[in-house]
Amino acid sequence: IMGRHAYGDVYKNCEIEVKGAGKAELVFTYEDGTEERKTIMQMKGPGILQGIHNTEKSIESFARCSFRYALDEKVSVWFATKDTISKTYDGKFKEIFQRIFDEEFKAEFEKAGLEYFYTLIDDAVARVMKCEGNILWCCKNYDGDVMSDMVASAFGSLSMMTSVLVS
């Protein structure tokens, strides 16, 4: 079973194509007018930029829905990101999933004989190809889009895949 976060990432992104050299920055302006600013890159020529986002509230909701669904279906949860590269964005997903599990679901999972397992997305891809099932593999929006197609193709057919929106 694939669990795909249905908010944010590249599906609510902002992109620009730059025509020449310049400084690419990420800027956040708080309601009080103060700013956080980070240089992404000093572009030496034309290129492309993409900004993505997510909210803690949405990630928390995804985590809770995932753990509840897994308990209902009596399956363990795998969660995978690339937090070794995306330390802030993917790291926040990892942190929230772990906190929600520890504070709200750990006892229920132990009682049901189920597990929560975090790993890097690379490792999850390798593991899922050998997996006999009985898991809910949770991914961020884009990762879940791509990986659900891979799983459906490897274990049947894209045309046989079904989707259920859970909130």
Region spans (language model):
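Glycine-rich phosphate/nucleotide-binding loop
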Residues: 128-167
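Short, acidic/small-residue loops that bind anionic groups at enzyme active sites
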Residues: 26-28, 113-116, 160-167
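Glycine-rich phosphate/diphosphate-binding loop of Rossmann-like nucleotide-binding domains
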Residues: 28-32, 36-121
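A glycine- and small-aliphatic-rich helix-loop capping segment at beta-alpha/alpha-beta transitions
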Residues: 16-24, 93-100, 154-164
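Short acidic, glycine/serine/threonine-rich loops at helix termini
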Residues: 12-17, 88-93, 128-131, 148-152
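N-terminal glycine-rich phosphate/adenylate-binding segment common to multiple enzyme folds
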Residues: 1-36, 48, 142-146
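RNA-contacting regions in translation and RNA-metabolism proteins
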Residues: 124-126
